[in-house]
Structures are given as structure tokens and as C-alpha cells.
């Protein structure tokens, strides 16, 4: 299994219930495809660098997961078909990246506690 990071931008006009339904739907898709969810981080609504599908803002969702490389095409196909998702990108993380990031975050938290 490899570690992947996916960022998706959800249409900004979706109300909270619809937005949560989209996020839960794609968590379920990953689970159905036998992926292990490591992290789901909702960044909220942010301004886009350039308009995408005539939208200047979007709700960002970052997902980190472990999966077989064979499921990525199916996952991205489902993202492409959902009208609520206006843009997405999935990247393969280097081996050990998740552990290094967790260690760095822990060191940062310890430094803040000492101050």
C-alpha cells in the first residue's frame, strides 16, 4: 500500500448539510475501495487563485490515505462525476513523509507547551 494525499475543492454554494454529505460520500468511497483513511482536514471556504467553473471561491478538503495504486483511477473517476466537486488533485507521498510530518507536528506542539 502507498500513501496518497488528495485535495478537493467543493462548490462554495453548497449549504452545510450538502457539503458534509459530499465529504462523507468520498470518505465512504475510499472505505469501499479498501483504503485506510489517515487524515481528513477541512480547510473551509477560501479564495481560488483563478476562477474554476466560474467560481472564485471553494471549500477545501484535504484527505491523506493509504491505498493500492489500482484504486486511484476509480476514486478520481468518481470525483470527476460529482457536480459538487469543482477541482481535485491526488498525489503520491514519499515513503516516510507521514511519519516525518507527525514528528514535526509533535515537536512544534512540545515547543509551544514549553513557552
Swiss-Prot record:
One of its GO terms (cellular component) is cytosolic small ribosomal subunit. GO terms for molecular function: small ribosomal subunit rRNA binding; structural constituent of ribosome. The keyword rRNA-binding applies. SUPFAM superfamilies: Ribosomal protein S6. InterPro entries: Ribosomal_bS6, Ribosomal_bS6_sf, Ribosomal_S6_plastid/chlpt, Transl_elong_EF1B/ribsomal_bS6. GO terms for biological process: translation. Disulfide bonds: none annotated. Binds together with bS18 to 16S ribosomal RNA. This is Small ribosomal subunit protein bS6. It comes from Syntrophotalea carbinolica (strain DSM 2380 / NBRC 103641 / GraBd1) (Pelobacter carbinolicus).
Amino acid at each position: 500500500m502507498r500513501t496518497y494525499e488528495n485535495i478537493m475543492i467543493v462548490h462554495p454554494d453548497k449549504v452545510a448539510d450538502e457539503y458534509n454529505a459530499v465529504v462523507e460520500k468520498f470518505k465512504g468511497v475510499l472505505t469501499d475501495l479498501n483504503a485506510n483513511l489517515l487524515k481528513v482536514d477541512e480547510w473551509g471556504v477560501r479564495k481560488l487563485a483563478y476562477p474554476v467553473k466560474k467560481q472564485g471561491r471553494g471549500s477545501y478538503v484535504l484527505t491523506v490515505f493509504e491505498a493500492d495504486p489500482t484504486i486511484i483511477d476509480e476514486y478520481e473517476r468518481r470525483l470527476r462525476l460529482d457536480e459538487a466537486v469543482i477541482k481535485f488533485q491526488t498525489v503520491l507521498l514519499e515513503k516516510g513523509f507521514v511519519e516525518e510530518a507527525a514528528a514535526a507536528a509533535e515537536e512544534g506542539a512540545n515547543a509551544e507547551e514549553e513557552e
